[in-house]
């Protein structure tokens, strides 16, 4: 039976982070009494973008990680890619919560996310060509 146990681990960790980001938006909406949009509030606008960025990049990375696992990737590579993805997403959140502008954590977080997506995309194509 084929399983996606390692992808499931990283999807679970990232799912918890995703819920945390959503709860942060709800908390800010309640505090500032804003139902839709950001209402001109920079804190809420930032929280919405942090959540949005996560929702934009994380699913593709997890799909590629799952494909890679199904294609027979080593546990070491799966942990390396999954761990780097989690680290990158956490750093991105920390960096954006630190400042709206550029920060080292934000830059490293996005570079890590891009690297994971690129490596997994190339590896999945490579495994297809070699099959």
Task: List the predicted regions and their residue ranges.
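Alpha-helical transmembrane segments
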Residues: 3-20
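A loop-to-helix transmembrane entry motif
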Residues: 14, 44-58
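Transmembrane alpha-helical segments that form the membrane-embedded catalytic/substrate-channel core
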Residues: 15-30, 86-95
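Cytosolic, membrane-interface loops and tails of multi-pass inner-membrane proteins
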Residues: 23-49
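Core segments of transmembrane alpha-helices
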Residues: 53-65, 117
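Short alpha-helical packing/oligomerization segments
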Residues: 64-87
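Interfacial loop-to-transmembrane junctions
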Residues: 91-116
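Juxtamembrane boundary at the C-terminal end of a transmembrane helix
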Residues: 121-131
């Amino acid at each position: 039976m084929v399983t996606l146990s390692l992808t499931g681990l990283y999807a679970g960790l990232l799912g918890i982070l995703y819920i945390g980001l959503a709860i942060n938006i709800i908390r800010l909406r309640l505090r500032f009494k804003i139902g839709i949009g950001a209402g001109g509030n920079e804190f809420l606008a930032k929280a919405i973008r942090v959540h949005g960025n996560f929702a934009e990049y994380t699913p593709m990375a997890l799909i590629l990680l799952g494909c890679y696992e199904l294609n027979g990737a080593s546990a070491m590579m799966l942990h390396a890619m999954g761990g780097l993805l989690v680290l990158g997403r956490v750093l991105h959140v920390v960096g954006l919560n630190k400042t709206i502008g550029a920060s080292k954590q934000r830059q490293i977080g996005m570079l890590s996310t891009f690297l994971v997506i690129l490596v997994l995309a190339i590896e999945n194509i490579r495994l297809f060509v070699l099959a």
